[in-house]
Curated annotation (Swiss-Prot):
Record-level Gene Ontology MF annotations: actin binding; actin filament binding; ATP binding; cytoskeletal motor activity; protein phosphatase binding; protein-containing complex binding
Naturally occurring in which organism (per UniProt): Rattus norvegicus
Protein name: Unconventional myosin-XVI
Entries under CDD domains matching the protein: MYSc_Myo16
Homology family: In the N-terminal section; belongs to the TRAFAC class myosin-kinesin ATPase superfamily. Myosin family. In the C-terminal section; belongs to the NYAP family.
Biased composition (Basic and acidic residues): 1220-1238, 1869-1878
Encoding gene per record: Myo16
Amino acid sequence: MEIDQCLLESLPLGQRQRLVRRMRCEQIKAYYEREKVFQKQEGLLKRIKPGKSQKVRFGLADMIQDAIIHHHDKEVLQLLKEGADPHTLVSSGGSLLHLCARYDNVFIAEVLIDRGVNVNHQDEDFWAPMHIACACDNPDIVLLLILAGANVLLQDVNGNIPLDYAVEGTESSAILLAYLDENGVDLNSLRQIKLQRPLSMLTDVRHFLSSGGDVNEKNDDGVTLLHMACASGYKEVVLLLLEHGGDLNGMDDGYWTPLHLAAKYGQTTLVKLLLAHQANPHLVNCNGEKPSDIAASESIEEMLLKAEIAWEERMKESPSVPSLAQEELYEEILHDLPELSSKLSPLVLPIAKQDSLLEKDIMFKDTTKGLCNQESQDGPPETSMVSSSSKPEQVQLTPPAPSDDLATLSELNDSSLLYEIQKRFGNDQIHTFIGDIFLLVNPFKELPIYSTVVSQMYLSPTGQRSPSLPPHLFSCAERAFHRLFQERRPQNIILSGERGSGKTQASKQIMKHLTSRASSSCTMFDSRFKHAICILEAFGHAKTTLNNVSSCLIQYWELQFCQRRKHVTGARISTYMLEKPRLVAQPPGQGSFLIFSWLMDGLSAEEKCGLHLSNFCAHRYVSQGMREDVSTAERSLNKERLADLKHALNVIGFSALEVENLFAILSAILHIGDIQFTALTEADSAFVSDLQLLEQVADMLQVSTDELASALTTDIQYFKGDVIIRRHTTQIAAFYRDLLAKSLYSRLFGFLINTVNCCLQSQDEYKSLQTLDIGILDIFGFEEFQKNEFEQLCVNLTNEKMHHYIQEVLFLQEQTECVQEGVAMETACSPGNQAGVLDFFFQKPSGFFSLLDEESQAIWSVEPNLPRKLQGLLESSNTNAVYSPMKDGNGNVAFKGQGAAFTVMHYAGRVTYEIRGAVERNKDSLSQNLLFVMKTSENVVISHLFQSKLSPTGSLISSYPSFKFGGHKSSLLSKRIASSMVGVNKNYLELSKLLKKKGTCTFLQRLERGDPATTASQLTKSLADITAKLQKGSPHFILCVKPNTSQLPGVFDHFYVSAQLQYLGVLGLVRLFRYGYPVRPSFEDFLSRYEPLASVLLGEKKGQPAEERCRLVLQRCKLQGWQMGVHKVFLKYWQVDQLGDLWLQMQRKIVTCQKVIRGFLARQHLLQRMSIKQQEVTSIKSFLQSTEDMALKTYDALVIQNASDIAREHDRLRKEVHAAYHRNRQEEGTKRAEDQGGCRHAHSNSVPVPMAVDSLAQALAGPSSRSPSLHSVFSMDDSTGLPSPRKQPPPKPKRDPNTRLSASYEAVSACLSATKDAASEALTRPRPHSDDYSTMKKIPPRKPKRSPHTKLSGSYEEIWGPRPSGTMGQVGKHHAPGTLGVQWASPDSMPQCTPQLPLHLPLPQGDYDDDGEPVYIEMVGNAARAGGSETDSPDQGESVYEEMKYVLPEEGCGPGMLTFLPASPPLFLETRKAIILEAGEGSCQPLKDTCDIPPPFPNLLPHRPPLLVFPPTPVTCSPASDESPLTPLEVKKLPVLETNLKYPVQSEGSSPLSPQYSKAQKGENDQLTSPGFPVFNGPSRISPPATPPPPPGPPPAPCGPPSAPCGPPPAPCGPPPVPCGPPPAPCGPPPAPCGAAPAPCRPPTHFAFPPDSVLVTAAKALTNSDLPRTQPKPSSAPVLGPCSPFVKAPYSPGRTARADLRKASSTFSPPSPYSPPNSRPLSSPLDELASLFNSGRSVLRRSAVGRRIREAEGFETNMNLSSRDEPSSSEMASETQDRNANNHGTQLSSSLSSVVAAENGNPVTNGLAEDDGCSRLCLSGMGTSSFQRHRESHTTQVIHQLRLSENESVALQELLDWRRKLCESREGWQEAMQHPEPRAPPPPPCKKPTLLKKPEGGSCTRLSSQLWDSSI
């Protein structure tokens, strides 16, 4: 059964113990079972003989390691003699010397060093033996290694040297510091050495990145540079890597991120940095651990947990929006409750040991009946906090007075000083300045001058005194705070005075002000300081006759401030010389420590019973000073203070159980004092008299009773392997009893101080902060009693030392420096006799304390030896300050006889001390027996207290390294690599070159090791430590005066106060500050402190020497009274304030100048950015304008090229049509009749192929809802099938210059449609591909790229021809009228020569050829209706264009279905019609997908029949033959409608798609649409809305039935050419339709165009009263109503201006290309066409020259003409012509003619007359831009001129010559021009060729005049 230890630790105590017991039982059971199984397997065959022992052989390496650990020195020597290798390595990679350093085995360490073991060997963590010795604080090993030549500067894996692991104050630390100082290594040099490694990596990384290296490059293990820097704590390297894009979440091969490594190795600053840069805290490594799971400290773990929560919230809110993260976000984590277990020991006890201790603790409480009901262990005790009375509602401060500064008094003497102080004391003005020294008189009452409001009033930006505020402690603290950052050195506030003068309270107020004004979290630090002071007051203060709360120790507070942010980052308290003798014996009238009084009055009866303190006053330690007349108010106050103490202990980390344990230890201390000894034998051997009490004490201490009794009464020593036992006498046993109590209390007090320090230490990364300290020293005051003993001597000598330091700093140093610098000093001060007194006691080796330590080293010295030695010292001393009481101060003998007393002349007076018992009180070290017993205590706290070591000053050494607690030394030494790397990188050499090689004798002499642990030695080292700290900073003195000895408020004792003023030297201080020079900075310090002031005042004289620069600054500041020394400036104290004021004024002026300049620069920068932006906008506009110009030029060239190509093509095709017509008319009719019901084929290929639509003759023969179109009307013959009697073409009309040229015959045929029912047919709707339709559209159709298979057709009705190779479908042979039957079959099952319907089917995506051309087919609206009258619907006269879907057959052989979906429900039919796809003869193969047919051209009237567009046959004589011949024409006289067709830009090399199924509009997963035939494609995502119907024209009159087809088609021949060149890109959005929601206007890519002239035409159509109108649909919206679809699109101003220039250059152009509606008369297109046909002349004529040009290129064309003869009759109405020679009348005809022009054998049923010559090429919308429809180019005007020429042959010749020059690259075209052929006669007017090709041998002399018809 295995359970994780973390789980056990998280369980409650009782549950964990039960679980542990169960686990133990199961383990034992499993062990027995395993043994039984093992015995059964062995079979018990081999029994061990009795008496024969089994031996296990271990290796020598294992044995020697075990012997070193257990200090078996003889065994180690024996193993080395047997051959054990002294160089054996342990498992961690270290040597045996590492083990010796770990377990403090000095003897074996010396042996190993003698045998050559490397003292600098490093283990796998780069720890040398010196590192381990310092970490374990083994000074003997440290000294041995140093003497052996160990390198004290070796760095481990974390970059730490051994000194970093030596706890401050330990002997190991002292040895290392002394050695480094002896060899010339200071602390700054150590810091530079530690920075070598990170600076080296920083340099390498910079070089690597500058050379183009990858910041995220990984090594073989996947580790990046960021991983390495985060693990090592190199903050600067991490910042550099992050700036260059380092991957925060990069993982190595073990899935460890940089955040994992920073958390694991305790890099708190880097953890903050990574989290601030959005590192993911949720990533896990290969072990499934997040960074918070492996955090090295609780602060890092809490930080990471907080980051995880923030990350989750950020992901929930907005995953894409990163939140701002700063390092300050993680600085608010409070650590008010640190774990106590982390402070107990460096080596944490295992959980089994902790459980064992807890079990025994429970047993202990059970046996002693335990404690009564207590508060919950988890919650803090309920306390009633003491409300502070120092926060009044209103604050009234006394106004400033002239006597605020005593240094300004006119009369200086003792009486005047005393008078001013008394007067101020009477006015409650207890604060007074003496220059920079502060004088405080204790009022013995609370004054409302220490509130938070007052503290805020004294906040100053410069630290100078405010003239409007009286003197105050806060002002002194404010000055120290500002001096801290001005001088950038520590500041020390020293409080001195007698006991009860108010030093402790003054220090509290100073700390309160500093923490509140400079704390990042004021409430947190105020609370911590309050609780820390409460604990310190309880355990370190006592009630005396001079003070109710008298300090019994020296306190030195250190407040750490961040140098950059200027707020408190932590604090630490150092305590010295605790009055431990006060615990066991109090002077008369004084009490013990306050904690015992609080326990007596604050504990309840039950609690006292549990602690065995029912009779509290009966204990000896408290009975001496306990008063019986304690008032009830005082008892109540003590109870409240105890409650405050419990709360304070909870705050700093003690749980309720631990507080209970703490009180139990205090109770044990009191019970120890009650143990008495008695002598049962004559040898006076001591025995414990009360064994029950001893057992009770042992239970409370949780030690063995026998061991405790033996340790108290005997002394066991080991000498050369022998054990020596000595019995103590009762006196010695009592001495060790009291020493045990004092030691336990002292160590407990040290433990509490360390815990407080841990609580006050900020959790910020101390190593990364540059900190400065403000120290506050509070020493116990001078005291004198009737009987002064050794304790009073130590207290008064401490005050003597501090007074001497003040005199030395204030007087002696100034006097010495004045002499050295040659400055005259106005006043002189006598040094006094303090130096002689201090030398008498502290001088070595002849001082009194040295003699006392010698006597204390004896096991038990004889008392009379010390008086004798003291007498000899007094006689030999040269000072009169210390003398024997037998003599008076003048040396006269007072009395005879030797006595153990002497008199000392202190600075405060004469005091006589008795030395009786001084030796015993000086001893402060327990016997080894007592130490061993206390170390083995089952109480965790007691065991820890005695396992910890003591510092030389007697303080308990903390378990934490020294660098955990700032301080000046730690800020220099222990700023880790993660700190800011500032400073010069000094390349230090090896240790041998760095350290000065000196003899070890001097070093050993300076070590002064071996000092005994005595009170005198602790006092000496404490004073030395305090003095060293004070000398590092600038002092600020506060003199505290006690007004009376009775502690009464308002009482001023003149004599008592005058005595204090005299020995404090207040008068001397006043004179010093008035006449002396208290401020004496060096020249460099002066210039550095006032650098802004000096840099401005010096001007050009900055290069002068420092002395001259200081002189100039002082002169220009107009200061007087200063003096210049040789190296220093001597200033008066008020001159510092004046310089500070000038510096502040100058700083304000500088800030103002910088503000103005920065604002100016910012504005300039903004203007520059705006200018750059404007330039960019201008450049973009210029680029777009130039691009538009180039596009227009290209358009002009393409129009000319395209028109010429089409003209030649029409000429060639015209000849073929007429030749095939006369030759194959009869054959076509016969074949058409035979193949009416034949199987139709549909095929698909990657390259578009010609398509054919089955004839709808059967549907037209019967009753149909669809009227024949105008195409059919004008192509119908009579029943005999003879051609139309009109043989001559209509007369040539006059041309309008605005009419766009086009050679397309479809533009003409689009206007020649008529219906059967002339009464209900609107004749004015343009065809979708006509020029009018394109002109109407804002986005013209794009010109598709020409394909060799492109064919032209102007009708939907029939496409005849043989099945080409690769066809994949057949058309069903039998189908119902009105339906379209399609049968799918494999290509090999198709018949060869059958009429077919080749449909270009969609293939899967990827099967299409990018060069494929689109084939457009328009589906008939009502053709699928089998029957019905023409009056079934109001839409009977209109053709409804609907979407068609092909529904797959279920089983693969069933009929498919093409479903028509209405495109415009609001305007047209709502019914859905389907075309059944019937199965044919071949095998049926189902389609994969259902194909939708979007309505490409919706809402067309029946006279606008659907259009089938096939790729045209290109002409190679044009270099731009890839351009579409479907040039849009601008027919001004046709009423036009609007559609929502969108024409996307075609990419180069791809097939143009249909407008609704372009590549730009298709989805990512949509199937590719058919390049040419949208019928079988999927549904469009954009379905264009319906177009409102235009105003109808006059209805045509039907005449004649349809004719039968005639003429067989010839076989195809000739290879097609390859197209080239991309089509122009379309531009401009289509307008929204009326009656529907307007479509969003897509902005053009680059160009915008003016409004279409179609608006003019439409408006004209509505206002023309000459035309007959048909009634519009009721649901139709007005054409030009509010929702009119003719929306004005955005246009380009530049393009409009350019059009005006071009219009001016054209002789035929009107003033504006966009004429208003009334600019031209409106006429019917039928009237225009009738005038043309009635003219009798050929509009377009053939050109033999053009034919030769094409024939020279080897073209072979095949033209099959098949038509059907239908009876027809026509009526011609002639009206006046417009200026374009267009007739306004309408030519009506009811004869239906079927003229089929077939290409490649595909019969095409055409609804136009063969002779009209108005064949029109279908306009493709893919390649045309909007400006192609709206603008007239210059080249177009050229073609207009050629068309209007009277001599057409001459015009044609001019056109061909011009075209050849531009387009032809062949060399044979010149010869073709020399042999023109005669012009062929025009075809009959009743026949219209739709697809024209050049016939073999045809003449190309002239193009057909019909192709030049400009009426369309």
